[in-house]
Amino acid sequence: MAAVWRWFVPERPSFYDRGLLALTFSLMGIGLMMVASASIKEGPGGDMFYFTKRHLIFLFVCLGIGVGTLYLPLERWREWSGRLLVGALGLLFAVLAVGRTVNGAKRWIGFGFFNIQPAELAKLALIVFIASYLVRRSDEVRGNIAGFVKPLAVVFLLAIMLLAQPDLGSVVVLFVCTFGLLFIGGAKLVQFIAIIVAGLSALAGLIIYEPYRLRRVTSFLDPWADPFGSGYQLTQSLMAFGRGGFFGQGLGNSVQKLSYLPEAHTDFVFAILGEELGYFGVLVVLFLQLLLAMKALQIGRTALLRSKFFEGYMACGIGIWFSFQTVVNVGAAAGMLPTKGLTLPLVSYGGSSLIAITMAVAILLRIDFERRLDTSHVIQREAA
């Protein structure tokens, strides 16, 4: 216990947020454990640990990319914000041109062993771009409708490419992050009301237009009306939670993962966690996810108070992204929201999601590091 206490409360000031690092590694560890358990019947060729080995490789790749991101000065992100967005648009276009189709959706670009899902990288690229835009055009955003609409035009362009895949879940994430950042940036409330009404109308139209989306919504409202058809996945997920009780069936003892619950190691890994670790495990993971999002928002608030607006907007955008995606994934697994195909941050299987989220965490660590470094320099100057 003493060693743990010294880790979180070091005797000498630390130049990085140990709590954020501990949260990240804890969620990664839980994710590896649950992917190993949930995917044990899914591997091709009879390899029970196929997805576990791939997930472990993804984690090592993520750590390498995270370290590289940590060494990148934040000013570079600001300088490259436009190029990152153009790169994300290029990758989304490439998906439509040469992407792989899985379960009726064309969302991945195949590179042999590894498939890239550009939608995950587009989320981070958009947050960086919007943060840069708010710094460059802060008066315009606060003063007139044009400054509010311009970033939304960028999101609409991304949304068109994502809907062609189709990937409505990522579109919703992009709009929520953009609205959140515009609100923090000082946009007028009346502008939000008008755009939100228009957005909800468009969302309803998209749901009605595509039969599979309409089936998802109707099955979410009453999954037991068609438990072996459109409501099958959700009813199996609810049964997993029901079997888990308070303390679960024990790690590895899930029944629903045995070919009953589709996508058990990706979109519905939270349901398997509930079955094996019970509501106790569910609360632990939700608490860790809440702390992760709060850490991001706290880092953002501190940066904004110190007039580090680009860094503050980026951190707040990342916090909104993490929290909203967690709510949607958990809500879909628990039958409170329609399924959207979004991962549970740092827990679900998926290399592109892990890479994007690890890069985002590394950016948070870098923001906090530069803040601590500035504070240290101020103290040294005052002492001199």
From Swiss-Prot:
Cellular localisation: Cell inner membrane
Pfam families: FTSW_RODA_SPOVE
Membrane topology listed for this record: Multi-pass membrane protein
EC class: transferase
Transmembrane feature ranges: 20-40, 55-75, 84-104, 111-131, 144-164, 167-187, 189-209, 268-288, 317-337, 344-364
Record's keyword terms, sorted: Cell cycle, Cell division, Cell inner membrane, Cell membrane, Cell shape, Cell wall biogenesis/degradation, Glycosyltransferase, Membrane, Peptidoglycan synthesis, Transferase, Transmembrane, Transmembrane helix
Ranges facing Cytoplasmic side: 1-19, 76-83, 132-143, 188, 289-316, 365-384
Residues on Periplasmic side: 41-54, 105-110, 165-166, 210-267, 338-343
Signal peptide positions on this chain: none
MF GO annotations: lipid-linked peptidoglycan transporter activity; peptidoglycan glycosyltransferase activity
Cellular component aspect of the GO annotation: cell division site; plasma membrane
GO biological process: cell wall organization; FtsZ-dependent cytokinesis; peptidoglycan biosynthetic process; regulation of cell shape
Keyword Lipoprotein applies: no
Pathway listed: Cell wall biogenesis; peptidoglycan biosynthesis
Reaction(s) the record says it catalyses: [GlcNAc-(1->4)-Mur2Ac(oyl-L-Ala-gamma-D-Glu-L-Lys-D-Ala-D-Ala)](n)-di-trans,octa-cis-undecaprenyl diphosphate + beta-D-GlcNAc-(1->4)-Mur2Ac(oyl-L-Ala-gamma-D-Glu-L-Lys-D-Ala-D-Ala)-di-trans,octa-cis-undecaprenyl diphosphate = [GlcNAc-(1->4)-Mur2Ac(oyl-L-Ala-gamma-D-Glu-L-Lys-D-Ala-D-Ala)](n+1)-di-trans,octa-cis-undecaprenyl diphosphate + di-trans,octa-cis-undecaprenyl diphosphate + H(+)
EC number of the protein: 2.4.99.28
Family according to the record: Belongs to the SEDS family. FtsW subfamily.
UniProt function note: Peptidoglycan polymerase that is essential for cell division.
Alphabetized NCBIfam families for the sequence: ftsW, PRK10774.1
Protein name: Probable peptidoglycan glycosyltransferase FtsW
Organism: Tolumonas auensis (strain DSM 9187 / NBRC 110442 / TA 4)
Gene: ftsW
